[in-house]
């Protein structure tokens, strides 16, 4: 009995949070081995009240709307199971971070786990792309290229993230997290390591050939120009110089954004038209959480092969209202963009790590918002857990500041 009397769930929850952040990009399933026990231990921890943050009510509103949408799903049992293991666990992970990350040392431990995971993912991506031992053939990388449109593009880097677009979204979030720490005025040896990591992240981002990720990266440059230093606008001259002088597959992929010759561009436009029809016909509850792939065949006018399964609309702004209805979409987007607003307040008013995490939070929200215009990377469990986890981490400093103020008053 004495063992249980001195048992401290909080310590174990913290370690499990660190492990979860490390495992998230490495496997779409492995991180559950640390996340589920963390949720269970937090539930047992009666001494620590849960914190939902300033935007929690909007998150709860989205959970409620998505739950109600299950009633109109063509497969209620599937939608319910999906709802329990995706949005509910996203929210649980989000709450865990806001509840248990209480000081800068704990924030730094999370960052170490994130950066260590990023190093592993980058190394694996480079080894994979180098085609050591015929790895690209074994991993079916050819499934993500269009040889008819891009005959010289033989493979795209995707590392551990299932496909290149998801890998691009992951890289954008880590890049957004790294950049602010390079902007600190203090010269430290860590900045050299951050710069090396950033260089490899950008290198890998280029080799994903993910056009949506590239456009999102340009949006980050605009944000740096607006919120930090106008000299960052010079980076656009570098991009223009590369596009004008280099005529390889990078340039071809980028220019293809502005035409419908590429099959993926035409497919997206057709998907958006079909998804908009879903929103028009089901404005209140949507078509049911997780049911897009079940309902899409009824709206399909583009894809001739009936064996092709379409899981999402490749557009966040259409996907969400389509599956949960317009009220649910309002809750979702207030919750989503609200993190950028709260992070901006942390950037303007915070001190130390809270300030720089605030800037990271702004960049992460912006990157995923732009990326969501032509894709829906948050469909992936790993990417969604990562995004909401980072969003919570980047505003967790606001809770730390409040605790310090309350402690001072006492």
Q: What function would you assign to each model-found segment?
A:
Residues 1-82, 102-115, 182-192, 344, ...:
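Transmembrane signal-anchor hairpin modules in multi-pass inner-membrane enzymes, especially those
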Residues 13-17, 146-160, 269-270, 305-318:
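Juxtamembrane membrane-water interface segments that cap and precede transmembrane helices
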Residues 18-20, 35-38, 67, 92, ...:
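Alpha-helical transmembrane segments of multi-pass inner-membrane proteins
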Residues 71, 123, 129-132, 208, ...:
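A membrane-periplasm/extracellular boundary helix in multi-pass inner-membrane enzymes
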Residues 77-78, 82, 161-164, 209-212, ...:
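Membrane-interface catalytic loops of GT-C/OST-like multi-pass glycosylation enzymes that act
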Residues 259-273, 285-324:
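Long extracytoplasmic/lumenal interhelical loops at the membrane interface
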């Amino acid at each position: 009995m004495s063992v249980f009397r001195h048992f401290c769930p909080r310590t174990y929850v913290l370690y499990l949070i660190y492990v979860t952040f490390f495992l998230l990009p490495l496997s779409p399933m492995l991180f559950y081995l640390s996340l589920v026990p963390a949720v269970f231990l937090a539930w047992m921890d009666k001494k620590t009240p849960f914190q939902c943050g300033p935007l929690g009510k909007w998150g709860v509103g989205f959970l409620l709307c998505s739950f109600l949408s299950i009633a109109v799903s063509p497969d209620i049992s599937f939608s319910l199971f999906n709802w329990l293991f995706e949005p509910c666990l996203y929210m649980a992970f989000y709450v865990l971070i806001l509840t248990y990350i209480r000081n800068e040392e704990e924030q730094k431990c999370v960052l170490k786990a994130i950066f260590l995971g990023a190093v592993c993912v980058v190394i694996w991506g480079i080894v994979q792309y180098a085609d050591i031992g015929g790895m690209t053939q074994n991993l079916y990388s050819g499934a993500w290229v269009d040889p008819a449109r891009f005959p010289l593009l033989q493979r795209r880097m995707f590392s551990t993230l299932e496909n290149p677009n998801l890998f691009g979204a992951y890289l954008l979030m880590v890049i957004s997290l790294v950049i602010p720490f390079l902007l600190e005025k203090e010269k430290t040896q860590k900045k050299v390591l951050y710069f090396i990591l950033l260089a490899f992240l950008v290198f890998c981002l280029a080799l994903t050939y993910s056009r949506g990720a590239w456009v999102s990266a340009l949006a980050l440059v605009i944000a740096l120009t607006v919120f930090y230093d106008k000299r960052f606008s010079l980076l656009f001259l570098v991009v223009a110089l590369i596009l004008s002088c280099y005529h390889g597959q990078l340039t071809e992929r980028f220019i293809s954004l502005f035409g419908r010759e590429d099959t993926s561009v035409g497919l997206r436009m057709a998907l958006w038209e079909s998804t908009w029809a879903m929103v028009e016909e089901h404005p209140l509850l949507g078509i049911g959480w997780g049911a897009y792939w079940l309902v899409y065949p009824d709206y399909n006018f583009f894809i001739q092969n009936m064996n092709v399964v379409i899981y999402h609309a490749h557009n966040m702004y259409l996907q969400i209202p389509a599956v949960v209805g317009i009220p649910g979409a309002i809750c979702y987007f207030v919750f989503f963009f609200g993190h950028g607003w709260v992070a901006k307040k942390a950037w303007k008013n915070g001190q130390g790590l809270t300030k720089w995490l605030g800037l990271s939070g702004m960049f992460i929200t912006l990157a995923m918002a732009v990326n969501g215009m032509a894709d829906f990377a948050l469909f992936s469990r790993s990417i969604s857990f990562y995004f909401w986890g980072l969003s919570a981490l980047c505003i967790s400093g606001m809770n730390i500041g409040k605790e310090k103020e309350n402690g001072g008053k006492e």
